[in-house]
Amino acid sequence: MQRIKRALSLLSLTVACSTAHATVTGVALVHGTGNQTNAYSDYWQADMVEGVRNGLTDRNNLLVVNCDFTQYMWDSRAAGCLAGQLTSFIQTRHLDRLIVITHSNGGNVMRWIMSNPTWDARYPAIIQHLVKVDALAPSSAGTPLADAVIAGNVFESALGWLLGYKNDAVRQQQVGWMATYNQQYLLGTAGRPALPAAFRDVVGTDVVSGLFSSQAYCGGYTNSVGLEITQNWLSSCSDGFIECSSASAAGTVWFRDTQKTGGSVLNHNQSRRACFGLPSILANDIKG
């Protein structure tokens, strides 16, 4: 009898260990507005990507997405491209769990997939594997700066590096347009059904651009200065591109920058860079 009990215990332990071993987690980094062909270097940069990779048991289970996010979020070159790359990633790496980290408008494209499972036959499997989306500075309720670009005012040329020039993704991020999309096509905002997986916002609250402030230099001083200028056309709480109310409009707020960065703020450029411990925050969350 004792032998049988021992055998059963060993069998249970073996099953438990093999089950735990079989759980494979992957992380996908999804860029914001722009037509990316090398987002690793051009959008995120190596320090950010490799810092996030540190959270994975298998460091090969990381995907840096490259798609044309100058298009409307539902376009085959935007959500269709993203769905294709995520599907291939899940299949080739044999993933059980998928964590997606988005920046800016990338959160809208991901939210389109999560909100519209019947739009594309690939969406349901992605949603099934999706554990959570960590949305860095998402433009969930749009930005007045998109309205400014479409209106063709004097700031259009100054915003080109940040947003683009009158493309469909910029049109989509106008405040009124995003309000309509949120009411009719997207889940996760106030008064709408919840998203099928956690959508957690990281909110940038300010811009520091002082010449003698070390905070201003992370991610590039000139970018910080540019965001300080654009912040003048936004509410008092913004990262220079996205107002806090927009960044926190969908899902739930994971944290506001200063709560986890030792008091440093994350402007809209810094929230995609290895600034103020952000890669470690994300990596530790993946491990958790």
Regions found by a protein language model. Give the residues of each.
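Bacterial N-terminal signal peptides that target proteins for export
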Residues: 1-8
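Bacterial N-terminal signal peptides
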Residues: 9-16
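Sec/Tat signal peptide C-region and signal peptidase I cleavage site
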Residues: 18-22
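Serine-dependent carboxylesterase/thioesterase catalytic core
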Residues: 27, 79-185
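Catalytic metal-binding/acid-base residues of hydrolase active sites
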Residues: 33, 106, 137-139, 205-208, ...
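Short aromatic-enriched loop/helix-cap "lid" or pocket-rim segments at secondary-structure transitions
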Residues: 41-42, 143-149, 154, 211-218
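C-terminal catalytic-base region of ester-bond hydrolases, centering on the histidine
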Residues: 192-288
